[in-house]
């Protein structure tokens, strides 16, 4: 494992354990057996380090989705599977508290805002593809695919976030009910 990967691994665990604000660069340096010079050489700022971790997690998520979606024959099936996968893999859940702290404190700056929007758009884009292909295949007729994609992404994120303490089987049942109601509203 190279030094950059070690720093990323240690930082991720600290962000999960302590949250964003309570994690210090000093702790990251100490536990990664690195130096502040190395940390700043690779990431420039704590914010950039955190964003790099989120990018890595997003890439892992997208790779998993690519492998899973080939099981689906229809876009309806893709919608159900994407939502269930969001729930069962818990998307970013271990980092959720750190993300909320980071989001509320740093989202105001233009560069961070741009990077966070880019991450969010990757998630929304998956819905966009599902809905657009469903339109083309006659599974539904959506006039504003962009808006419907954003609505679906935010609704699913809410279900994932606010049902976390519930039994996984109940959560899956709830997510499938959401998917059914949502898609029934879109059906021709």
Swiss-Prot record:
The gene is qacR. Residues 24-43 bind DNA. Residues 1-61 form the HTH tetR-type domain. Homodimer. Binds cooperatively to DNA as a pair of dimers. It comes from the Bacteria. Transcriptional repressor of qacA. Binds to IR1, an unusually long 28 bp operator, which is located downstream from the qacA promoter and overlaps its transcription start site. QacR is induced from its IR1 site by binding to one of many structurally dissimilar cationic lipophilic compounds, which are also substrates of QacA. It holds the Pfam family TetR_C_5. GO terms for molecular function: DNA binding; DNA-binding transcription factor activity. Keywords: DNA-binding, Plasmid, Repressor, Transcription, Transcription regulation. GO terms for biological process: negative regulation of DNA-templated transcription. This is HTH-type transcriptional regulator QacR.
């Amino acid at each position: 494992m190279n030094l950059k990967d070690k720093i990323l691994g240690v930082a991720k665990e600290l962000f999960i354990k302590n949250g964003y604000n309570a994690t210090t660069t000093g702790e990251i340096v100490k536990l990664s057996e690195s130096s502040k010079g190395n940390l700043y050489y690779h990431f420039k700022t704590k914010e950039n380090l955190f964003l790099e971790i989120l990018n890595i997690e997003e890439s892992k998520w997208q790779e998993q989705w690519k492998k899973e979606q080939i099981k689906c024959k229809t876009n309806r099936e893709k919608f159900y599977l994407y939502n269930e996968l969001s729930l069962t893999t818990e998307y970013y859940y271990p980092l959720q508290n750190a993300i909320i702290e980071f989001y509320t404190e740093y989202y105001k700056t233009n560069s961070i805002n741009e990077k966070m929007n880019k991450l969010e758009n990757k998630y929304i884009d998956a819905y966009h593809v599902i809905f657009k292909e469903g339109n083309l295949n006659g599974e539904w007729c959506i006039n504003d695919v962009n808006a419907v994609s954003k609505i679906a992404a935010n609704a699913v994120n809410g279900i994932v976030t606010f049902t976390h303490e519930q039994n996984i089987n109940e959560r899956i049942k709830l997510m499938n009910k959401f998917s059914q109601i949502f898609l029934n509203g879109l059906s021709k």
